[in-house]
Amino acid sequence: MKIRSLFSIMALSFGVSSVQAINYSPDNVSAELLLKVPGNDAVHHSLKFEKIQNSEYDYQLVGNKKLPLMLYQNIEGSDNCKRITMLVVALEDVYFNYGQLVKTASRHDDCLFYMPGFWYRRNLRSPKEAPSFHTSDSWIVREDRLSTPLTAIYDEKSGKSFSVVRIDEFDSDALTTHKEGEVILSGKTSIGYTGFENKDGISALSFGYPYREAPKTYISKLTLAPSVEAYQFLKKGESITLTWEVSERNVNDFSECVKQIWEYSYDLYKPEPVNTPYSDEKMKEVLSNFFVESYVDDTPTKYYSGVELRTATCENLDVAEVGFVGRTLLNAFNALEYGESQNRKDLVDNANSIFDSYLQNGFSSRGFFNEVVHFKRNFVETNLSIRRQSEGVYAVLYYLNYEKQHGRKHPEWEKRLKTMLDAFLKLQNPDGSFPRKFKDDFSLVDKSGGSTPSATLPLVMGYKYFKDKRYLEAAKRSVGYLEKELISKADYFSSTLDANCEDKEASLYASTAAYYLALATKGQERAHYAELAKKAAYFALSWYYTWDVPFAKGQMLGDIGLKTRGWGNVSVENNHIDVFIFDFADVLHWLSKEFNEPRFTAFSEVISSSMRQLLPHEGHLCGITKKGFYPEVVQHTNWDYGKNGKGYYNDIFAPGWVVASLWELLSPGRAENFLK
């Protein structure tokens, strides 16, 4: 068994500059070897670095007594970027776990921490049931939790950041019989661990192979379990080569730390588009079956059943949801536009029935959308959200604009939307934010402003459609809030509604909101909003995978060949990947042109190609019962939303928003065309 480095051993220094060199010396680096005999507790061995001569390696790592492994380490690179190569050779059959620690010289209390797609700052926006400083100030996690297998430590006082990234082929994983404690792997894994530790008040980068997780392992939604250590078997005479890169940078703030690390990660991994057989036209043809089989017409408001479905049956349920995970109205617009272009009368008729029925029966007494309705229980959700309301208005504005272009007018819909947009003006706080949740009478349920950017989009669109400058001014105030409280503080949180934590959608929505305002303004204003869109975009991009997570044999996603590059982690609380993208691909293309940044367009192509892979159709249903019902909760690491674990989906899913997201990805230029 031999794991080779993905890249040749060479000095790399992407985006690295510093006055001081990394102190990668035996005095500042510690290493340990854990050895396990099945049926016995593991034994820990502290290792010493002994300089060796006339060898391709710089050091041999030795213990206080003879070990069943020979360990060699080579260090290459510049002062600020060190490539560390480990050779592990088995002298006898052995089960082992290797770990290393590099101190940074920064006080732990002065530092913020970054593990892409999983850890931002100190994760203090997350509940104590998820990984955060609420539980511990030191965390190590398995690499497949992260969109890049990397940890960075940012010292706010010195302006320095330190990072470690793993470099490998990542071609295998292995099952275990237990999820906690000392576990022996059933085969070969490529997955190691990475993280940060507080060592006597000093921050340290921690990394090793195979994986460990401490002080807890995050195994399910809001479920922390005891720590885990995995042990890799090496047969006598076999060897493994392991490679990491440790870097140091000067940065101005946490935002620049994330930006530089994303550029560095992209340049290091060089993700390429995934080769799939699905053109835009084929994708839409298959996805359109969702509009057919999910349509429900025996209720006061017609809708597409896209919430709380079971993957095993995909049978329609009684839940209608305007936005968020249902996205009924956006799907109705997509079905109408596609149906007319393809002469699909069934799609057109159903879509029009949805809009007509919502106009008649889809509103509360105060003029807000009935955003979630359970018909069999005769239950209407009374806690309203700015996100669902905004996404409903957004969809109807696209519908009205499309209808107007085709000579069809809907004055009652226009009246309804103006009432709603005026209500948004009333809801908006003096600081420009919008409450996350509220009642029909405008009383507040959740006053936090994390969902504010979702309101910016329909306000900008409403300004353009109704030519009412009040909506544009409200949109500007909302982005003023985003700039002050989210973007400048690098604190993106609570955009999604099924979790309250650091999440991808907050930064994605913030970037998109600034993009919409840039499209609607000119001169210095436009340039300012473009800069904000770019700054937030790096945080959004940090959630998307630059690498392909390995799966074990027998894990369905691996067996069907899923490549994870281009898929996005969801949030700290929900540690799975999904296809949430909507028109963010357009944002990336636009930013690429505005700032001459080819990485944005190139990675957008990776996202677009990769998110086609699990298209369910005859002979390739990917674990979903019905054609076109694209999967939602894609579990790529040792975590689940409630069922099934790595390599599978949760048993409950919401294809409604998934189809809507992919459809917008496949319909480029919508916002620019609407706002021009």
Each language-model region and where it sits:
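Short Pro-Gly-centered flexible turn/kink motifs
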Residues: Y231-S255
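Low-complexity, Ser/Thr/Pro/Gly-enriched N-terminal "stalk/linker" regions
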Residues: S25-I52, L234, N252-E321, S353, ...
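Glycine- and aromatic-rich loop/turn segments at beta-sheet edges
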Residues: S288-A320, Q360-E381, F424-L444, E483-C501, ...
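Extended, well-ordered alpha-helical scaffold segments
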Residues: C257-E293, N343-N361, Q405-L425, K467-K484, ...
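Sec-dependent N-terminal signal peptides
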Residues: I3-G15
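Beta-strand/loop-rich accessory regions of lumenal/periplasmic or secreted enzymes
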Residues: Y24, P38-N40, D58-N64, M70-K236
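Active-site lining segments of carbohydrate-active enzymes
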Residues: N378-V380, Y398-K469, K484, Y538-Y544
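Well-ordered alpha-helical scaffold segments within catalytic/enzyme domains
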Residues: L329-K345, E391-K409, S454-D468, Y509-E525, ...
